[in-house]
Amino acid sequence: MAVGSRLAVLFSAALAFVGVSSVLTARPAVAQATVSVACGSVGAEFDLCKTGAEAWSKKTGNQVKVVSVPKDSNEQLALFQQLLSQKSGEIDVIRIDVVWPGLLAQHLVDLSKEVPKDVIAQHFPAIIEANTVGGKLVALPAFTDAGLLYYRKDLLEKYGRKPPTTWQDLTESAKIVQDGERKAGNDKLWGIVFQGRAYEGLSCNGLEWVDSFGGGTIVDGQGKVTINNPKAIAAIKLAASWIKNIAPEGVLNYAEEEARGAFQSGNAVFMRNWPYAWALSQAPDSPTKGKVGVMALPKGGAEGKNTGTLGGWNWAVNKYSKNTKAAVDLAKYLTSPEEQKRAAIEVSFNPTIPALYKDKDILAKNPFIGELLSTFTNAVARPSRVTGSKYNQVSSEFWNAVHETLSGKSQAEESLAKLEKTLTRLSRNGKW
C-alpha cells in the first residue's frame, strides 16, 4: 500500500475511533464540552492517558473522546500533519514528541496566553524552551528523558577504576577492564556500547559528544550552522577511535535495544542509553542485577560539561479545535504535578517538574529517579525548534556524517566540513 493511502486509512480509522470511544461523565447530566484526545497507542502510556482523561472528565463535567493512534512515532507525526494540514478540529489535544514543536507550531495554540506563568515555571526550563517556537509556547511537558551512562560497578571496582568524569577517563577505563577480562577468558566483553546506527538515536549520541566538549548544538539558537569547529571535531574523532578498539564494529548498527541487550547480557563495561534501561537491568532474571551503576554522561575533558540529549513527550492543543478552553484545561490537567506523580509511581515516567524528584512517594517507589535531576537540569535540546520543518533533514544529514566518520569512510574534519556546507545551503544562510 502506498504511503499516502496508508496514512489516509490511519487517518480515517483514527477519526472513526473518536466517534466510538467516548468516556462519559457521571455528572452533570449534560456535559459542558466534548474534547477528543490522542492518547498514543496501546499499552501503559495509553492506559495512563485514558485514566487521566477520565479523571478530568469526572472533575469538570466535560465529555472526553479518547483516540488511539499508530504505535510508530513517525506514523503518528504523519497522521497529525495530515490532520492539521486539513485544518481539522476532530482531535483537540495531541501528544507530541519533543522534536515536533517546530514541525507543527503553526497549527497549535499558544499556551503562554492560556496557562498561568507560575504553572509554566514549574517545569524544567530546557523543556519549556524546546516547546517554544517563535515566542509561542506550543506544548506543555508531560514526561522527559535524557541520555545516561550505565556502568558495571563490579568490574570498575575489580580493576580499581572510578566512575569516569570525562570521556577520556571512560576510554582509558574501558580499555583496561576489557583487556583484563579478555586475558581472564571473557573474550565477548567490550568497553562500551551505544546507539551507533544511522538514525535519530545517533543524532542524540552525537549531539551529546559534541555538546559535552563545548562544540555547540549543530545549529545555534539564532539559526547559524555551528557544527564545523575544533571541539566538535575532537568529540567525533574520540568516538570514532572506539570502534573495533573498545566498541564492537557491530555497534554501527545498534539502536537502543541492541545496546541494552549487549550490556545486560554482561558483554559491555559501559553503555549510553535512556533511563528506561535501568529497571530492565535490575529485573530478577537480569545477569546484571545489582551490578549496575548509572550517572550523568561524562564531560568532554576538564573544560567540558555533563550533558544528555533531551527526550520526552508533551501535550499540545489543536488550533482548529472548537473547544479550545476545555482542551487547554485537559492539557493542563494531564501535565499537572498530580498526574506526573501518578505517572512516575505507576509506570516510572520521569517528571518534567523538578520538585517531584524530591517527592517521598516517588522516591519510595523508584529510588533511582532522584539521581536523574541534575541530568535533566543540564539536558541539551536538539535544534528542532530553530530549524522547524527542516529538522528531519538536519538530523539525517548529521547522523549520516557521524556514521561515516565512525565507520572510517571519512575523517571527522572532512565529514563536518561537508555537513556545514550542506546545512548552510539547507538553511539559506541561517534563515530556516
What is the meaning of each model-derived region?
Residues 276-289, 300-400, 429-431:
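C-terminal lobe and pocket-closing loops
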Residues 174-176, 221-252, 297:
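Glycine-centered hinge/linker elements that transmit conformational signals in sensory
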Residues 55-125, 130-132, 154-165, 262, ...:
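Extracytoplasmic "Venus flytrap"/periplasmic binding protein-like
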Residues 112-123, 129, 182, 190-199, ...:
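Short, solvent-exposed loop/beta-turn-alpha elements that line the ligand-binding surface or hinge
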Residues 97-146, 162, 187-188, 202-205, ...:
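Hinge/lid segment of periplasmic solute-binding proteins
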Residues 34, 63, 157, 377-432:
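Conserved C-terminal helix/tail region of periplasmic/extracytoplasmic solute-binding proteins
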Residues 32-43, 62-68, 92-93, 138, ...:
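Short, well-ordered beta-strand elements
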Residues 138-142, 147, 171-224, 268:
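Extracytoplasmic/periplasmic solute-binding protein
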